[in-house]
């Protein structure tokens, strides 16, 4: 049942337009161009750290799939690309393999191939309110020898899904237990509706080490569930429900000291630069890599290399030699993102005057 649902999700994403109609919010963010960047583009360094591990670029292959025979090849190609490029990779929900050990190999193949990459295991937080505990979390981690455990928070999807689990009571308590008991860091991950500052603060207090905002602007799982069963009309109504990615980054970065993963509608290097300048640590990409991963790891690598080059150009044009420099560059927040910041009491003006270098001549 669970494995067939996973295949449904992949097929719908590939065959139907399930992208959000609401944008991720990066169109409201303007990086201030520097006509004299005072850097050599060839010297720009994309390396950074994520949860203590050095990676070659602030780009993550975000959680997509696993748990069905027909998607094993996708995970293989994603793993090859992650290993070659030294970037993190998150697997899809491992619940199917926890409940049916015959499906474990669709996940274990990832570590067999990506022996040095940063890997994130993945389970739904709602399962821990239904009986899962430390043992299941450890199984997921050990299955891929994971560097971290992502707990996905998907109340919207569960509410729309015909088989959905909607008892989210005591989930925060379960997150706290896992954060205290596991030897690897816990990442709280939304799946397309974003995370607000209130939840971000609570998650930090519960002990998570990173938040994946999973904002509005990319794939809509309400849309995916709508196409799975059109008799459930709510999917269409809630297609664009949630917090746009740029806004969610702003909320989480401003009110916590956690590492922020930006996912949800990120499609190019300029958006990556904007997300990092807003406070993200790394940016996750999923849907654009899905079709490519069905064909070959080379297509996945080509797409990620394109993103890296675009990010380098954006960094060059704002005078940033290192990823850390992006967090000091000037950016202007306009439009609905600015309106949101005002309504929520976030100081959006401070981002406009963070110039990396004051060039003194003579």
Task: Locate predicted features.
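C-terminal domain-closing interface element
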Residues: 133-134, 138, 312-349
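Active-site cofactor/substrate anionic-group-binding motifs, chiefly glycine-
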Residues: 50-100
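Short, charged beta->alpha transition segments
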Residues: 42-51, 75-80, 103-111, 136-140
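Alpha/beta enzyme core
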Residues: 79-80, 84, 113-119, 126-262, ...
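Shared catalytic-loop signature of beta/alpha-barrel
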Residues: 254, 270-273, 277-325
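A gly/proline- and charged-residue-enriched helix-loop-helix capping module
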Residues: 86-125
